Amino acid sequence: MTTPSTSNAPKTLYQKVWDAHVVATPEGEAPIIYVDRHLVHEVTSPQAFSGLKVAGRKLRAPEKTFATMDHNTSTRSASLDALSPMARTQVETLAQNCKDFGVRLYDIHHPNQGIVHVMGPELGITLPGTVIVCGDSHTATHGAFGALAFGIGTSEVEHVLATQTLRQLKAKTMKIEVRGQVTDGVTAKDIVLAIIGKIGMDGGTGYVVEFCGEAIEALSMEGRMTVCNMAIEMGAKAGMVAPDQTTFDYLEGREFAPKGEDWAEAVAAWKALKTDVGAEFDATVVLDAANIAPQLTWGTNPGQVVAIDAPVPNPADEANPTIRASMEKALDYIGLTAGTPMTDVAINKVFIGSCTNSRIEDLRSAAKQAKGRKVASGVTAIVVPGSGQVKAQAEAEGLDKIFIEAGFEWRLPGCSMCLAMNDDRLEAGDRCASTSNRNFEGRQGRGSRTHLVSPAMAAAAAIAGHFVDIRKPY
């Protein structure tokens, strides 16, 4: 048995959080790390709880486990009768498991229910320097707070429930620095899509990425969560942003954040959670924020992305035969022709929501485009707030009225049309401007065609009936 490194050499943010959580390093085996927070939902937890019951085990730390219903829930009604038989079974099973094991549950009737990666941060469950896991690939979202957060499989969910630990190999480190500031109309979603476009959907494989630079520091916590949310879409294990005053201001006073003297002590400790001067990364990527335009995907993975003022790429211009074949396949599925201006691409569906872009800042941005306008004829557009708190705040600000008057549908919280796992899905041939995180074949429904964009770009597309450059009048 070896012990964690206590070297005084400069360390990255990831190294600091990792070192603080290694509890054992068995010779010849993966290190064992401690898990501070475990988030669960109705889809990846049933088998894990069943395994505990069969083995006669209890939860190691039920107070560190938080559950919500989000993937299969209806955004039209809070009634169980609105769910499909399978969805109803899953949410009822989660409710029973939480009751049996003493887990805090935010069910469909709870005012704080919502998408797991939205309600966790807004309740203060997510804190700097913690290790957070969830049976969901977009757990990286929580890294925006300087946490080490990543998705795990169902067997690992069971292991964490039983032991509050996990075997993990240490990842390599990558620094992605976005220098300077973005121009008007460019958002966090555009930044992360530009990053993925630069390094590809597998450019971060094997790495934990730290996002930094002036453009990242200027983002709100909502924006940082958007960036970290899509770290997995570049293949990374996790994404992180060092906590700063923006982080502390967001967290102060939230339900599960430290209070009183504990708060002052926590902030003092969190201020040390930054990469030391001289710390080395295994890889570095640099982008100039001023060169980033509003982005949208043209193909069937998040790396197939261009600026709004660019045309659909031509596979013939790609020298790599493997990439060229992938581009040709994507264009065939998505139904676009090389050379077509992206502003000529018409859409008939719009989805504003998901764990990427369903927070209050996102809805304000979309509402700004929708105010005083009308959704184009033939377009169906839905707005799905990420949580009960977001919904209540948006309604207090009158955003729901702006959307409804413009012809958008205003829904209940949930994962919704991000994935074809509930009643919100696309039909074959539909073309959707979506604020979600994946544009894979069939992701939003069999035969559906998805274009990833920011909330402002999605709302503008709903109004125009096609993609537009929101930096210009339309």
UniProtKB/Swiss-Prot annotation:
The gene is leuC. Catalyzes the isomerization between 2-isopropylmalate and 3-isopropylmalate, via the formation of 2-isopropylmaleate. HAMAP family: LeuC_type1. Its cofactor is [4Fe-4S] cluster. One of its GO terms (molecular function) is metal ion binding. It is an enzyme of class 4 (lyase). CDD domains: IPMI. Gene3D superfamilies: Aconitase, domain 3. Keywords: 4Fe-4S, Amino-acid biosynthesis, Branched-chain amino acid biosynthesis, Iron, Iron-sulfur, Leucine biosynthesis, Lyase, Metal-binding. This is 3-isopropylmalate dehydratase large subunit. Belongs to the aconitase/IPM isomerase family. LeuC type 1 subfamily. Its EC number is 4.2.1.33. Pfam families: Aconitase. It catalyses: (2R,3S)-3-isopropylmalate = (2S)-2-isopropylmalate. [4Fe-4S] cluster binds at C355, C415, C418. GO terms for biological process: L-leucine biosynthetic process. Heterodimer of LeuC and LeuD. Binds 1 [4Fe-4S] cluster per subunit. It comes from the Bacteria. InterPro entries: 3-IsopropMal_deHydase_lsu, Acnase/IPM_dHydase_lsu_aba_1/3, Acoase/IPM_deHydtase_lsu_aba, Aconitase_4Fe-4S_BS, Aconitase_4Fe-4S_dom, IPM_dehydratase_rel_enz, IPMI_cat. Pathway: Amino-acid biosynthesis; L-leucine biosynthesis; L-leucine from 3-methyl-2-oxobutanoate: step 2/4.
